[in-house]
Amino acid sequence: MAPLAARRPACLLALLSVAAALFLTPTALAAGGKTGQVTVFWGRNKAEGSLREACDSGMYTMVTMSFLDVFGANGKYHLDLSGHDLSSVGADIKHCQSKGVPVSLSIGGYGTGYSLPSNRSALDLFDHLWNSYFGGSKPSVPRPFGDAWLDGVDLFLEHGTPADRYDVLALELAKHNIRGGPGKPLHLTATVRCGYPPAAHVGRALATGIFERVHVRTYESDKWCNQNLGWEGSWDKWTAAYPATRFYVGLTADDKSHQWVHPKNVYYGVAPVAQKKDNYGGIMLWDRYFDKQTNYSSLIKYYA
């Protein structure tokens, strides 16, 4: 099979020609199983514009803010939204929710300032999350977004050890998965590396069986699993291992990345493969900043 990612703009036409020759069939064109679901990460670059602007674009069905990047044994917490004015984010969250776009918070990220080495640290993190961003109201816990109430938590656990207790955190969050009345869940998601099986600390959390969705990052330079090599086999394993969880294909909107996939290749290659699975959920985009530059979501949304 031809590689799906565009390695260089110079070879783009060649890639498209090969993809068209391989995939231009009635089955590929039908591309069943579409959901129209597109999740985007927001908060990694101040130049990406406001959260309100992202929701008003009409391109996304969920926005994940990133990251709460410090937590764990030392009892300290840090929210990094890349210099965005936090005083306006609360109103933007409510605006997004009024438009039917849920907003979640991703914890972890690419830094190394987090861990959950014990049950106690996991419960302490839950307490911080619940009182800072959800339904809690401890006077001693500041609320960065005022009385805005988020819709979910995403685990983006790039670093960790087998001792980390993200399973305890997930189970505690699941006990509080109704916000504001019946039918309003606290969405519990995870954003994982492409390769399967996952690292031990991620696998232990997912083994709880309570994650609503998982975003599989196929756009990074993982030697054994990326858009040039191996992602389809890993996709099969991920979706089979957790049949009750919805899986999202993670794509980059950065057209300068070696792992960027041309929209036509999403249509002819990525979407038909991903949508064969009964628990296909949609597409996750990294991230709003790149998408604003390239308008990638406007080109792939209707293939999702």
Curated annotation (Swiss-Prot):
Upregulation: By wounding, methyl jasmonate, and by E.graminis infection in leaves.
Top-level lineage group: Eukaryota
Cysteine pairings via disulfide bonds: C55-C96, C194-C225
PROSITE patterns per UniProt: GH18_2
InterPro entries linked to this entry: Cts1-like, Glyco_hydro18_cat, Glycoside_hydrolase_SF, Glycosyl_Hydrlase18_Chitinase
Residue positions the entry lists as glycosylated: N119, N295
Keyword set includes Mitochondrion: no
Region of interest (Interaction with fungal GH10 xylanase), ranges: 262-275
Gene3D superfamilies from the UniProt entry: Glycosidases
Record-level Gene Ontology MF annotations: enzyme inhibitor activity; hydrolase activity, acting on glycosyl bonds
Active site: E158
Subcellular location: Secreted
Pfam families: Glyco_hydro_18
Quaternary assembly: Binds to fungal GH10 and GH11 xylanases. Also forms a ternary complex with barley alpha-amylase 1 (AMY1) and insoluble starch.
Function: Fungal xylanase inhibitor. Possesses competitive inhibiting activity against fungal endo-1,4-beta-D-xylanases belonging to glycoside hydrolase family 10 (GH10) and family 11 (GH11). Possesses also inhibitory activity towards barley alpha-amylases. Binding to xylanases or amylases is necessary for inhibition activity. May function in plant defense against secreted fungal pathogen xylanases. Is similar to class III chitinases, but does not exhibit chitinase activity.
UniProt name for this protein: Xylanase inhibitor protein 1
Organism: Triticum aestivum (Wheat)
